[in-house]
Every structure is written in C-alpha cells, then in structure tokens.
Amino acid sequence: MRKKGLFCFLLMLAMVANGQPRKYLGGDISLLPSYEQAGTVYRDFDGKPIEPLAFFKKMGWNAIRVRLFVNPEFAPQEHKEEGVCQDLKYALNLSKRVKDAGFDLLLDIHYSDYWADPGKQFTPKRWEGCNKQQLADSVYAYTRASLQTMKRAGIVPEMIQVGNEITNGMLWPTGKLDPSGREGFDILCNFLKAGCKACREICPKSQIIIHTEKAGDWDVTRNYYQQLRYRQADYDIIGLSYYPMWHGTIPNLGRTLDNLNWLFPEKPVMIVETAAYYSHERDPWAKGDQYAEFYPISVEGQTQFTRELVTELNKHHNVTGLFWWFPEENGFNNEVTKGWLNRGLFDNHTGKALPAMREFSQFK
C-alpha cells in the first residue's frame, strides 16, 4: 500500500510539473458528408446557414471523431440505412477535411463491416473462418495498412481507438467474452496488442484509446481494465460511453470516474460517446425512454442533461475529453437514414443548432 501511495504521489507531481493534459471537446460527425451530399442545410441558433466545421470551431470544439469500418459494402441493408458507409476512402477524405480545418483527429476503428457495439462485434466477412492467431494477424495488417494510407495522405490522428465499445470483446465469436470474469481476455488482449503494435509503429505519437461502455457499472469497468493491466495491454487512455438511457445516473458516473482515478491514476479518461434525446419522432429506439423521469424527452430535457453532465465532468481532473455521438443528425427533407434518433445537436425539422450545444461547450 505504501509503494502504491508513493507511486500515485510521484505521478501527481509529474503531472503538475508537466502541466495538465490538453482537454478535448468534439463530436463524432462521421455522417456529415452524406448529409451535405443530400443538400442538407445546417443553421446556427438564429437560423442562419453555417458551415458545420467552422461553427463547431466557434463553439469551442478542438477535436473530431471519425469512424472506420473494414468493408461496409458487406453490411446488411438495415445497417446501410442507418448510415454505415465509412470505408477507408470515406474516412480518409473526412479526416483530411477535419485536419485542414484545424481540428485534432480521433480515428475510431471498428474491426467489423458495420456497427461494433455491446450487442454485436461481428468479424469482417473477409476474415471469417480465421483462427485466433490469423485474426490477430489480420488486425495488425489492417490497422497498419489503414494508418499507412492515411499517413501517406498527410493525415496522422492524434488519437486512435483500437475497437469500439469492446466491453464484450471483439471479432465474435472467437473474441467474445464475459467482462465480469476472466475467460476470453487472453484472446482479446492478443487482438488489442496486435492493433496497438501497428499504431505504435506507424503513428508513434498518437494516443491509443481502449473504449468500453459500462460507465455505470464500476465492478465490470474495474475488472475489465484490471484484466488489461495484468496482460500488459499497451494503451494510453480509457475511453467510455455514457448514455443516460443505458448507463445510470450522472452521480453514478462520477463515482466510476473517481474510482478510475484512484485505481488507474496513470490513465486519463475520455467520454468518447454521449448523447441524449430531445424527441422520439420517427425514432426506431423510441422505447428507450426509461430515463424520462430524470430528463424529459424534449429540447429542455436534452439541455438539462448536457448541463448536468458537463458540470460533473468538470469536477474530475482525470477526464480529458468529451465527444457527442452523431451531433450532425439533421434529417428533414432527406433520406440519409431511414429513421431519426433525435439525439443530435441540430433540430431535425429546422436544421437549427439546439440549446444543448451551448451547454456542451462549457466542458473545460
């Protein structure tokens, strides 16, 4: 215990001496080019047309998250209708635009042909039939080749996610695991080590993020990152998703953040995904309103949630990033997606920026 206390004290001194790490504010805008191609107009709070990236910059954003799928052409039609289209060419073009606009880049690699999340982490079609070592080799080769392609185009991400919401593993069924136990972590960590090795080789200055989504479950979160520590996984930042409809209350999130700071003081934490509803119109997830008793499903409820979340995060010095997921949703007069999620930061009917955008910008 004394050795651990001394280590934490020395680490704190080092942080003071070197200055606090930079804080990132931004969003995952991976569908923005598709909306723009459909003729979608984005507007500021007063209804005046805007260029989205310039507006985000004006609102204090300094980073953008871009997702990358392996071969989205193999995605089921239902997922294509949800906006799955981000192959390497798409991600590269958007990333170049992001960097040219002066933002730092978080590249979010989904090791799947479509959505990778707690309920699905399916192996890319072209990797099916591989054994666990062949899958690890594929992770390494794909990560390395993708980063090399981006680097040749002059794009080096400041941050790279090796996997997306991989609480339950990745590359199912081979890499599936129970995050509350120990089984499966050896295979998962071999996959992670392969991806991280490629990141270190091609983009040695990039920060590596390992992203899970059980922000409201401390026991699972603790066990998960302890298992990674035991296996010497090489990463820099703990990434969490936090959605109020799935992950508990904001005070509960605060306890998780405090505990992470105590147990993993060397690892900054980022909320790499958050969002909240302002409506349920045309929403395929409309049943996800079990949190309405805390935050009404309304513009005011979304604003209240954002204000309270930012207030909580600003209390935690170990939290160095906050990203809104799908802020660019703007569905009026287009069919970019089949339904509306109504969790973005622009009104689906008017294209106007929502008040939650102002509250979001208070993360400091």
Language model features: what each stretch is:
Residues N259-E266, S279-E312, H316-K364:
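Aromatic-rich peripheral "rim/lid" segments of glycoside hydrolase catalytic domains that contact
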Residues L10-N18:
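Hydrophobic h-region of N-terminal signal peptides that target proteins for export
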Residues L25-I29, I64-V66, L105-I109, E158-V162, ...:
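Hydrophobic faces of well-ordered beta-strands that scaffold small-molecule active sites
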Residues Q20-F55:
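Boundary/entry segment of secreted carbohydrate-active catalytic domains
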Residues D46, I50-L53, D186, K197, ...:
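Glycoside hydrolase catalytic-domain groove-lining segments
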Residues K57-Q207, H211-E213:
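Substrate-binding cleft and catalytic face of glycoside hydrolase catalytic domains
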Residues R2-F9:
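Sec-dependent signal peptide recognition
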Residues Y35-E36, T40-G47, N71-A75, E81-K89, ...:
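Acidic-and-aromatic substrate-binding clefts and catalytic sites of carbohydrate-active enzymes
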